[in-house]
Protein backbone atom coordinates (compact mmCIF):
# COMPACT_ATOMS: atom_id res chain seq x y z
CA UNK A 1 0.00 0.00 0.00
CA UNK A 2 1.37 3.40 -1.00
CA UNK A 3 2.30 5.71 1.89
CA UNK A 4 0.08 8.76 2.14
CA UNK A 5 0.25 11.84 4.32
CA UNK A 6 -2.85 12.34 6.46
CA UNK A 7 -3.69 16.04 6.38
CA UNK A 8 -7.44 16.58 6.94
CA UNK A 9 -7.25 17.03 10.71
CA UNK A 10 -4.56 19.72 10.37
CA UNK A 11 -6.54 21.38 7.59
CA UNK A 12 -9.65 21.50 9.75
CA UNK A 13 -7.71 23.14 12.56
CA UNK A 14 -6.19 25.75 10.23
CA UNK A 15 -9.48 26.52 8.50
CA UNK A 16 -11.92 26.19 11.33
CA UNK A 17 -9.96 26.84 14.51
CA UNK A 18 -11.01 24.57 17.34
CA UNK A 19 -14.63 24.26 16.26
CA UNK A 20 -16.07 20.76 16.44
CA UNK A 21 -16.50 19.02 13.07
CA UNK A 22 -20.02 19.18 11.67
CA UNK A 23 -22.32 16.29 12.55
CA UNK A 24 -22.45 13.57 9.92
CA UNK A 25 -25.81 12.19 8.85
CA UNK A 26 -25.32 8.42 8.65
CA UNK A 27 -21.66 7.69 9.42
CA UNK A 28 -20.03 7.56 12.84
CA UNK A 29 -17.08 9.95 12.76
CA UNK A 30 -15.27 7.84 15.37
CA UNK A 31 -15.47 4.88 12.99
CA UNK A 32 -13.94 6.94 10.21
CA UNK A 33 -11.10 7.98 12.49
CA UNK A 34 -10.45 4.34 13.35
CA UNK A 35 -10.47 3.41 9.68
CA UNK A 36 -8.13 6.28 8.86
CA UNK A 37 -5.68 5.02 11.48
CA UNK A 38 -6.00 1.50 10.08
CA UNK A 39 -5.24 2.82 6.59
CA UNK A 40 -2.15 4.57 7.89
CA UNK A 41 -0.98 1.31 9.48
CA UNK A 42 -1.73 -0.59 6.26
CA UNK A 43 -4.12 -2.84 8.15
CA UNK A 44 -5.07 -5.86 6.05
CA UNK A 45 -8.63 -5.68 7.37
CA UNK A 46 -9.32 -2.48 5.41
CA UNK A 47 -6.80 -2.77 2.58
CA UNK A 48 -9.05 -4.38 -0.09
CA UNK A 49 -11.85 -1.86 0.43
CA UNK A 50 -9.44 1.06 0.68
CA UNK A 51 -7.57 0.06 -2.48
CA UNK A 52 -10.86 -0.30 -4.35
CA UNK A 53 -11.96 3.13 -3.14
CA UNK A 54 -8.72 4.78 -4.26
CA UNK A 55 -8.96 3.03 -7.63
CA UNK A 56 -12.44 4.47 -8.20
CA UNK A 57 -11.32 7.89 -7.00
CA UNK A 58 -8.41 7.84 -9.44
CA UNK A 59 -10.82 7.12 -12.29
CA UNK A 60 -13.08 9.93 -11.08
CA UNK A 61 -10.15 12.33 -11.36
CA UNK A 62 -10.28 11.84 -15.13
CA UNK A 63 -14.03 12.36 -15.44
CA UNK A 64 -15.41 15.45 -17.10
CA UNK A 65 -17.86 17.40 -14.91
CA UNK A 66 -21.46 16.73 -15.86
CA UNK A 67 -23.97 19.54 -16.35
CA UNK A 68 -27.68 18.99 -16.63
CA UNK A 69 -27.94 21.78 -19.21
CA UNK A 70 -26.31 19.42 -21.73
CA UNK A 71 -29.21 16.95 -21.62
CA UNK A 72 -30.57 16.13 -25.06
CA UNK A 73 -34.22 16.38 -24.02
CA UNK A 74 -35.88 19.71 -23.27
CA UNK A 75 -38.20 19.73 -20.24
CA UNK A 76 -41.74 21.12 -20.72
CA UNK A 77 -40.58 24.33 -19.05
CA UNK A 78 -38.15 24.94 -21.89
CA UNK A 79 -35.38 25.33 -19.30
CA UNK A 80 -32.60 22.76 -19.57
CA UNK A 81 -31.56 23.54 -16.01
CA UNK A 82 -34.65 21.55 -14.99
CA UNK A 83 -34.19 17.89 -14.13
CA UNK A 84 -36.27 15.49 -16.20
CA UNK A 85 -36.62 11.72 -16.08
CA UNK A 86 -39.09 9.07 -17.18
CA UNK A 87 -40.82 6.35 -15.19
CA UNK A 88 -38.76 3.22 -15.87
CA UNK A 89 -41.63 0.72 -16.10
CA UNK A 90 -43.87 2.54 -18.57
CA UNK A 91 -44.21 1.34 -22.17
CA UNK A 92 -46.14 2.30 -25.32
CA UNK A 93 -49.63 0.80 -25.41
CA UNK A 94 -49.51 -1.67 -28.33
CA UNK A 95 -53.26 -1.27 -28.85
CA UNK A 96 -52.93 2.45 -29.64
CA UNK A 97 -51.54 3.82 -32.93
CA UNK A 98 -49.38 6.37 -31.15
CA UNK A 99 -48.78 4.19 -28.09
CA UNK A 100 -50.33 6.81 -25.80
CA UNK A 101 -50.93 6.87 -22.98
CA UNK A 102 -48.12 4.57 -21.88
CA UNK A 103 -48.99 1.51 -19.78
CA UNK A 104 -47.16 0.06 -16.77
CA UNK A 105 -45.17 -3.18 -16.84
CA UNK A 106 -43.71 -3.48 -13.34
CA UNK A 107 -40.07 -4.44 -13.20
CA UNK A 108 -39.49 -4.17 -16.96
CA UNK A 109 -37.25 -1.26 -17.88
CA UNK A 110 -38.17 0.61 -21.03
CA UNK A 111 -34.94 1.52 -22.91
CA UNK A 112 -36.38 5.02 -23.38
CA UNK A 113 -35.78 5.51 -19.65
CA UNK A 114 -32.04 5.61 -20.25
CA UNK A 115 -32.26 8.21 -23.02
CA UNK A 116 -33.08 10.93 -20.51
CA UNK A 117 -29.70 11.80 -19.03
CA UNK A 118 -30.65 13.69 -15.86
CA UNK A 119 -30.92 10.70 -13.56
CA UNK A 120 -27.79 8.97 -14.81
CA UNK A 121 -25.74 12.15 -14.60
CA UNK A 122 -26.94 12.88 -11.09
CA UNK A 123 -26.02 9.34 -10.01
CA UNK A 124 -22.59 9.51 -11.63
CA UNK A 125 -21.85 12.87 -10.04
CA UNK A 126 -22.94 11.70 -6.60
CA UNK A 127 -21.05 8.41 -6.81
CA UNK A 128 -17.88 10.15 -7.96
CA UNK A 129 -18.14 12.78 -5.24
CA UNK A 130 -18.58 10.06 -2.63
CA UNK A 131 -15.47 8.22 -3.79
CA UNK A 132 -13.43 11.40 -4.06
CA UNK A 133 -14.52 12.79 -0.70
CA UNK A 134 -13.89 9.54 1.17
CA UNK A 135 -10.54 9.12 -0.56
CA UNK A 136 -9.53 12.65 0.41
CA UNK A 137 -10.61 12.16 4.00
CA UNK A 138 -8.73 8.89 4.39
CA UNK A 139 -5.56 9.87 2.52
CA UNK A 140 -5.25 13.63 2.89
CA UNK A 141 -4.48 13.95 -0.83
CA UNK A 142 -5.99 17.27 -1.87
CA UNK A 143 -6.37 16.26 -5.51
CA UNK A 144 -9.42 14.20 -4.58
CA UNK A 145 -11.14 17.04 -2.74
CA UNK A 146 -10.28 19.43 -5.56
CA UNK A 147 -11.97 17.20 -8.12
CA UNK A 148 -15.02 16.67 -5.91
CA UNK A 149 -15.36 20.43 -5.53
CA UNK A 150 -15.16 20.87 -9.30
CA UNK A 151 -17.92 18.32 -9.92
CA UNK A 152 -20.18 19.89 -7.29
CA UNK A 153 -19.71 23.43 -8.56
CA UNK A 154 -20.70 22.44 -12.08
CA UNK A 155 -23.73 20.35 -11.15
CA UNK A 156 -25.16 22.37 -8.25
CA UNK A 157 -23.57 25.81 -7.90
CA UNK A 158 -22.48 27.56 -11.11
CA UNK A 159 -25.50 29.55 -12.42
CA UNK A 160 -24.57 28.65 -15.99
CA UNK A 161 -24.48 24.89 -15.48
CA UNK A 162 -26.34 24.00 -12.30
CA UNK A 163 -29.50 21.99 -11.91
CA UNK A 164 -32.55 23.86 -10.67
CA UNK A 165 -33.43 22.70 -7.12
CA UNK A 166 -36.66 20.87 -7.90
CA UNK A 167 -37.90 17.66 -9.49
CA UNK A 168 -41.02 19.03 -11.14
CA UNK A 169 -40.41 16.79 -14.15
CA UNK A 170 -39.22 13.67 -12.36
CA UNK A 171 -40.43 10.29 -13.68
CA UNK A 172 -42.73 11.65 -16.35
CA UNK A 173 -45.04 9.28 -18.26
CA UNK A 174 -45.76 9.93 -21.95
CA UNK A 175 -49.43 10.63 -22.46
CA UNK A 176 -50.15 10.81 -18.73
CA UNK A 177 -48.07 13.40 -16.88
CA UNK A 178 -44.95 15.55 -17.16
CA UNK A 179 -43.80 14.66 -13.65
CA UNK A 180 -44.84 12.83 -10.49
CA UNK A 181 -44.20 12.85 -6.78
CA UNK A 182 -42.59 9.44 -6.93
CA UNK A 183 -39.94 10.95 -9.16
CA UNK A 184 -38.28 12.04 -5.91
CA UNK A 185 -36.93 8.52 -5.54
CA UNK A 186 -34.40 9.68 -8.14
CA UNK A 187 -32.68 11.92 -5.59
CA UNK A 188 -32.28 9.25 -2.92
CA UNK A 189 -28.67 8.99 -4.13
CA UNK A 190 -28.26 12.70 -3.32
CA UNK A 191 -29.37 12.10 0.26
CA UNK A 192 -26.82 9.31 0.53
CA UNK A 193 -24.09 11.72 -0.59
CA UNK A 194 -24.65 14.24 2.21
CA UNK A 195 -21.89 12.79 4.40
CA UNK A 196 -19.45 13.16 1.53
CA UNK A 197 -20.38 16.84 1.32
CA UNK A 198 -19.81 17.28 5.05
CA UNK A 199 -16.45 15.54 5.00
CA UNK A 200 -15.17 18.05 2.43
CA UNK A 201 -15.42 20.84 5.01
CA UNK A 202 -11.78 20.49 6.03
CA UNK A 203 -10.45 20.73 2.49
CA UNK A 204 -8.64 23.78 1.16
CA UNK A 205 -10.37 23.19 -2.19
CA UNK A 206 -13.88 23.39 -0.76
CA UNK A 207 -14.36 26.96 0.40
CA UNK A 208 -16.84 28.47 2.84
CA UNK A 209 -18.48 30.12 -0.17
CA UNK A 210 -18.84 26.74 -1.89
CA UNK A 211 -20.37 25.19 1.21
CA UNK A 212 -22.83 28.06 1.67
CA UNK A 213 -23.89 27.83 -1.98
CA UNK A 214 -24.46 24.08 -1.82
CA UNK A 215 -26.33 24.41 1.47
CA UNK A 216 -28.55 27.04 -0.15
CA UNK A 217 -29.28 24.65 -3.04
CA UNK A 218 -30.04 21.75 -0.70
CA UNK A 219 -32.19 23.93 1.58
CA UNK A 220 -34.22 25.24 -1.37
CA UNK A 221 -34.65 21.70 -2.66
CA UNK A 222 -35.83 20.13 0.55
CA UNK A 223 -38.18 23.04 1.27
CA UNK A 224 -39.62 22.37 -2.18
CA UNK A 225 -40.01 18.72 -1.19
CA UNK A 226 -41.96 19.74 1.90
CA UNK A 227 -44.11 22.49 0.38
CA UNK A 228 -44.76 21.76 -3.32
CA UNK A 229 -47.70 19.61 -4.39
CA UNK A 230 -45.36 17.15 -6.10
CA UNK A 231 -43.19 16.94 -3.00
CA UNK A 232 -46.14 16.52 -0.66
CA UNK A 233 -47.54 13.82 -2.95
CA UNK A 234 -44.35 11.83 -2.49
CA UNK A 235 -44.58 12.35 1.24
CA UNK A 236 -48.02 10.71 1.17
CA UNK A 237 -46.80 7.52 -0.49
CA UNK A 238 -47.04 4.42 1.74
CA UNK A 239 -44.09 2.33 0.59
CA UNK A 240 -40.36 2.64 -0.12
CA UNK A 241 -40.98 6.08 -1.57
CA UNK A 242 -42.05 7.30 1.86
CA UNK A 243 -38.91 5.80 3.41
CA UNK A 244 -36.69 7.47 0.82
CA UNK A 245 -38.56 10.76 1.26
CA UNK A 246 -38.06 10.82 5.03
CA UNK A 247 -34.42 9.85 4.68
CA UNK A 248 -33.80 12.70 2.25
CA UNK A 249 -35.59 15.29 4.37
CA UNK A 250 -33.58 14.27 7.43
CA UNK A 251 -30.23 14.12 5.65
CA UNK A 252 -30.74 17.47 3.91
CA UNK A 253 -31.85 19.15 7.14
CA UNK A 254 -28.73 17.92 8.92
CA UNK A 255 -26.52 19.25 6.14
CA UNK A 256 -28.21 22.63 6.36
CA UNK A 257 -27.63 22.82 10.11
CA UNK A 258 -31.31 22.27 10.91
CA UNK A 259 -31.34 19.04 12.95
CA UNK A 260 -34.62 20.02 14.57
CA UNK A 261 -36.31 19.50 11.19
CA UNK A 262 -34.84 16.01 10.96
CA UNK A 263 -35.92 15.26 14.51
CA UNK A 264 -39.47 16.44 13.80
CA UNK A 265 -39.67 14.35 10.62
CA UNK A 266 -38.56 11.22 12.45
CA UNK A 267 -40.79 11.64 15.47
CA UNK A 268 -43.91 13.03 13.81
CA UNK A 269 -43.86 11.30 10.42
CA UNK A 270 -41.45 8.38 10.14
CA UNK A 271 -42.69 6.54 13.20
CA UNK A 272 -46.20 6.40 11.74
CA UNK A 273 -44.88 4.79 8.57
CA UNK A 274 -44.15 1.64 10.57
CA UNK A 275 -47.88 1.10 11.07
CA UNK A 276 -48.42 1.18 7.32
CA UNK A 277 -45.40 -0.82 6.16
CA UNK A 278 -44.92 -3.58 8.74
CA UNK A 279 -47.77 -5.96 9.70
CA UNK A 280 -47.76 -8.40 12.61
CA UNK A 281 -45.57 -10.95 10.80
CA UNK A 282 -42.85 -8.26 10.30
CA UNK A 283 -42.89 -8.67 6.51
CA UNK A 284 -43.13 -5.86 3.98
CA UNK A 285 -46.23 -6.62 1.87
CA UNK A 286 -46.05 -3.38 -0.09
CA UNK A 287 -42.60 -4.38 -1.36
CA UNK A 288 -43.02 -8.16 -1.47
CA UNK A 289 -45.89 -7.86 -3.95
CA UNK A 290 -43.55 -6.34 -6.54
CA UNK A 291 -42.11 -8.35 -9.43
CA UNK A 292 -38.67 -7.88 -7.85
CA UNK A 293 -39.70 -8.58 -4.27
CA UNK A 294 -36.19 -9.26 -2.97
CA UNK A 295 -34.79 -6.08 -4.46
CA UNK A 296 -37.61 -3.81 -3.34
CA UNK A 297 -37.93 -5.20 0.18
CA UNK A 298 -34.20 -5.08 0.91
CA UNK A 299 -33.90 -1.63 -0.67
CA UNK A 300 -36.71 -0.32 1.53
CA UNK A 301 -35.22 -1.83 4.68
CA UNK A 302 -31.84 -0.38 3.74
CA UNK A 303 -33.50 3.03 3.62
CA UNK A 304 -34.75 2.39 7.13
CA UNK A 305 -31.20 1.60 8.21
CA UNK A 306 -30.25 5.05 6.95
CA UNK A 307 -32.99 6.48 9.15
CA UNK A 308 -31.65 4.41 12.06
CA UNK A 309 -28.21 5.92 11.48
CA UNK A 310 -29.64 9.44 11.41
CA UNK A 311 -31.61 8.72 14.56
CA UNK A 312 -28.39 7.65 16.26
CA UNK A 313 -26.84 11.03 15.44
CA UNK A 314 -29.86 12.77 16.99
CA UNK A 315 -30.11 10.57 20.07
CA UNK A 316 -33.26 8.83 18.80
CA UNK A 317 -33.20 5.02 19.02
CA UNK A 318 -35.36 3.79 16.15
CA UNK A 319 -34.60 0.19 17.12
CA UNK A 320 -36.69 0.66 20.27
CA UNK A 321 -39.76 1.84 18.38
CA UNK A 322 -42.70 -0.54 18.02
CA UNK A 323 -45.71 0.07 15.82
CA UNK A 324 -49.35 -0.40 16.78
CA UNK A 325 -49.12 -4.19 16.30
CA UNK A 326 -45.93 -4.42 18.34
CA UNK A 327 -43.45 -4.87 15.48
CA UNK A 328 -39.99 -3.31 15.66
CA UNK A 329 -37.32 -2.83 13.01
CA UNK A 330 -35.31 -5.56 14.70
CA UNK A 331 -38.06 -8.04 13.89
CA UNK A 332 -38.31 -6.78 10.32
CA UNK A 333 -34.61 -7.48 9.82
CA UNK A 334 -34.92 -10.88 11.48
CA UNK A 335 -37.72 -11.79 9.06
CA UNK A 336 -34.92 -12.50 6.56
CA UNK A 337 -33.00 -14.87 8.85
CA UNK A 338 -34.63 -18.12 7.66
CA UNK A 339 -33.49 -17.24 4.14
CA UNK A 340 -29.97 -15.97 4.72
CA UNK A 341 -29.09 -18.22 7.66
CA UNK A 342 -31.08 -21.39 7.04
CA UNK A 343 -31.29 -21.40 3.25
CA UNK A 344 -35.08 -21.27 3.14
CA UNK A 345 -36.10 -20.68 -0.52
CA UNK A 346 -37.51 -17.29 -1.40
CA UNK A 347 -41.30 -17.44 -1.39
CA UNK A 348 -41.79 -16.40 -5.03
CA UNK A 349 -40.01 -16.24 -8.37
CA UNK A 350 -38.90 -12.70 -9.08
CA UNK A 351 -38.67 -11.14 -12.50
CA UNK A 352 -35.04 -10.27 -11.75
CA UNK A 353 -32.74 -13.26 -12.19
CA UNK A 354 -30.26 -12.09 -9.55
CA UNK A 355 -30.57 -11.20 -5.88
CA UNK A 356 -28.39 -8.18 -5.24
CA UNK A 357 -26.61 -8.52 -1.87
CA UNK A 358 -25.53 -4.90 -1.37
CA UNK A 359 -28.64 -3.78 0.49
CA UNK A 360 -28.82 -6.79 2.80
CA UNK A 361 -25.09 -6.45 3.51
CA UNK A 362 -25.54 -2.92 4.85
CA UNK A 363 -28.71 -3.95 6.70
CA UNK A 364 -26.84 -6.71 8.50
CA UNK A 365 -23.92 -4.39 9.26
CA UNK A 366 -26.21 -1.91 10.98
CA UNK A 367 -28.06 -4.72 12.75
CA UNK A 368 -24.91 -6.52 13.92
CA UNK A 369 -23.27 -3.31 15.14
CA UNK A 370 -26.26 -2.87 17.44
CA UNK A 371 -27.04 -6.40 18.56
CA UNK A 372 -24.39 -8.99 17.71
CA UNK A 373 -21.07 -7.81 16.19
CA UNK A 374 -19.54 -11.27 16.43
CA UNK A 375 -22.15 -12.81 14.14
CA UNK A 376 -21.51 -10.63 11.10
CA UNK A 377 -19.18 -13.17 9.38
CA UNK A 378 -21.93 -15.78 9.77
CA UNK A 379 -24.39 -13.50 8.03
CA UNK A 380 -21.93 -12.79 5.22
CA UNK A 381 -21.57 -16.49 4.46
CA UNK A 382 -25.33 -16.91 4.51
CA UNK A 383 -25.89 -13.94 2.22
CA UNK A 384 -23.29 -15.23 -0.24
CA UNK A 385 -25.03 -18.59 -0.50
CA UNK A 386 -28.54 -17.19 -0.70
CA UNK A 387 -27.89 -14.42 -3.21
CA UNK A 388 -25.27 -16.26 -5.28
CA UNK A 389 -24.08 -12.99 -6.80
CA UNK A 390 -20.35 -13.24 -7.55
CA UNK A 391 -20.20 -9.66 -8.85
CA UNK A 392 -20.58 -8.26 -5.33
CA UNK A 393 -17.33 -8.36 -3.36
CA UNK A 394 -17.84 -8.09 0.38
CA UNK A 395 -14.13 -7.47 0.95
CA UNK A 396 -13.88 -4.47 -1.38
CA UNK A 397 -17.25 -2.91 -0.50
CA UNK A 398 -16.99 0.66 0.76
CA UNK A 399 -19.22 -0.43 3.64
CA UNK A 400 -16.07 -1.89 5.22
CA UNK A 401 -14.83 1.68 5.57
CA UNK A 402 -18.09 3.42 6.45
CA UNK A 403 -19.83 0.85 8.65
CA UNK A 404 -17.14 -1.44 10.07
CA UNK A 405 -18.31 -4.29 12.28
CA UNK A 406 -15.83 -5.15 14.99
CA UNK A 407 -16.82 -8.37 16.71
Language-model segments: residues:
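Bacterial N-terminal signal peptides that target proteins for export
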Residues: 1-7
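Bacterial N-terminal signal peptides
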Residues: 8-17
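Short, contiguous, pocket-lining structural segments
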Residues: 181, 185, 189, 210-217, ...
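Extracellular glycan-targeting catalytic surfaces
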Residues: 18-234, 267, 279, 310-313, ...
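Exposed boundary/loop context
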Residues: 9-10, 71, 288
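Long, repeat-rich segments with strong aromatic
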Residues: 244-347
